[in-house]
Amino acid sequence: MKNQIVYEFPLNERMRLFMRLEQLFRQARHFNQGGSVWDCRAVVATLNEIVALLARNDIKSELLKELDRLGGGLGKMQGNQHIDQAALATVLGQIDAAAQRIYGHSGRIGYQVMENELFKSVAQRTAIPGGTCSFDLPGYHFWLERDVERRRNEATEWLDCFHPVQEGIALILGLLRDSAAGIWETAHGGFFQKNLDHAAAVQLLRVAVPIELPYFAEISGSKHRFTVRFLTGLSNERPVQCSEDVPFQLTVCLL
């Protein structure tokens, strides 16, 4: 059982994009393990969100820029006697391999899904509340009612179209989250503020709160400074900032 709740806050648009996609990929993979029609509907709905997000962003360019930045920064550590060179070589190899897989992907990532007639018919109806009923999309209804394994295999093929993106994002965010150790801080009266070195490449803030505390963290900020407020309130009440001192673990992630 976990003993902390972790709140994350990206400090630039690229990291926001990566974290949104990370959540959607996890969500889709989770529901694809289920066998019910409702699980499959959730997979398709999540895939539609992924496609919509990718349509507004050049994900190949964003991933390659970030992988190149990480590779360049970590490459400067080669030969440093204070760095585990074997581990560094492994990470640099992973970065290069992820970049090569994205470079080697011809055309738009996920175009096989975007051009699928069944998927397009569903996507066109998702803006309408309840717009994917059987009387709206009988072909979709037929597909959902077929053999579970066949349906799941097709959904898996769709998800796998985005594998280079999912893999690249997982590598980048994994390295970023592991780039620093957490430090215990105290939010006096439920409030904490700290300046950041704008010359440093701070990409992500992580706030870990003991799970037994009755507060949640609200993070806001920019590359110059950030604020953490601890709020309390039930689901049917407007949250208010607590007046107690709150201990939490802060991780400032940068590479």
Swiss-Prot record:
InterPro entries: ZapD, ZapD_C, ZapD_sf. HAMAP family: ZapD. The keyword Iron does not apply. GO terms for cellular component: cell division site; cytoplasm. Belongs to the ZapD family. It is found in: Cytoplasm. Its main location: cytoplasm. One of its GO terms (biological process) is division septum assembly. It comes from Methylococcus capsulatus (strain ATCC 33009 / NCIMB 11132 / Bath). This is Cell division protein ZapD. Interacts with FtsZ. It holds the Pfam family ZapD. Cell division factor that enhances FtsZ-ring assembly. Directly interacts with FtsZ and promotes bundling of FtsZ protofilaments, with a reduction in FtsZ GTPase activity. SUPFAM superfamilies: YacF-like.
